[in-house]
């Protein structure tokens, strides 16, 4: 593969007549749940095989950008993904072992060190943002304090500055 100034120049070896046809240089999948899979099989061959060249992770308020977020017996990645994705906890526990970062910057940086198939963009997931600031139990049982809201705003602004595409929610009240 080549990029930018490395692209070859000159006459094409083959010209395809495209009149009346569609040209899709690559598809963008804005709603994936590949957050765990991208670290276990970063080439994401089933995605690329279908013509998708860019995926977004961190959808539906779930993701791994804050790291494992484990505290005592609480395991937010396993608990949250089990409910939404219906993935067995035994499988999710193995996925959590692949998480080696503990902040949003290191999460984005780790993509530079794995052999990605498609391009990957990320959202800050709202549920995991709440867990990061409030802990799992409090994040699902009470409203945040003003100080907690301010910390969430700070982390979200930091994430946007780092290159996150925005914040995802699950759409529930």
Show which residues each predicted segment covers:
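Histidine-rich, glycine-flanked metal-binding segment
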Residues: 1-26, 41
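Activation segment
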Residues: 4, 36-38, 56
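Short, ordered loop/turn segments at secondary-structure junctions
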Residues: 5-6, 60-61, 172
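Redox-cofactor binding/interface segments in oxidoreductases and associated redox assembly factors
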Residues: 17, 29, 57
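Metallo-beta-lactamase
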Residues: 26-35
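Divalent-metal coordination cores built from histidine and acidic residues
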Residues: 40-165
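Short acidic, glycine-rich surface-loop motifs adjacent to enzyme active sites
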Residues: 164-172
């Amino acid at each position: 593969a080549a990029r930018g100034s490395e692209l070859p120049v000159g006459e094409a070896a083959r010209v395809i007549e495209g009149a009346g046809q569609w040209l899709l240089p690559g598809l963008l999948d804005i709603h994936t749940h590949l957050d765990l899979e991208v670290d276990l099989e970063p080439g994401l061959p089933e995605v690329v095989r279908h013509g998708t060249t860019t995926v977004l992770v961190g959808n539906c308020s779930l993701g791994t950008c804050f790291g494992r977020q484990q505290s005592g017996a609480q395991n937010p990645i396993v608990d949250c993904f089990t409910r939404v994705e219906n993935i067995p906890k035994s499988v999710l526990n193995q996925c959590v072992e692949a998480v080696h970062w503990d902040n949003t910057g290191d999460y984005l940086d780790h993509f530079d060190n794995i052999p990605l198939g498609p391009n990957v963009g990320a959202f800050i997931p709202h549920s995991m943002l709440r867990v990061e600031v409030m802990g799992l139990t409090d994040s699902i049982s009470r409203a945040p304090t003003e100080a907690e809201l301010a910390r969430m705003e700070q982390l979200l602004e930091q994430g946007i500055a780092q290159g996150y595409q925005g914040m995802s929610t699950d759409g529930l009240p």
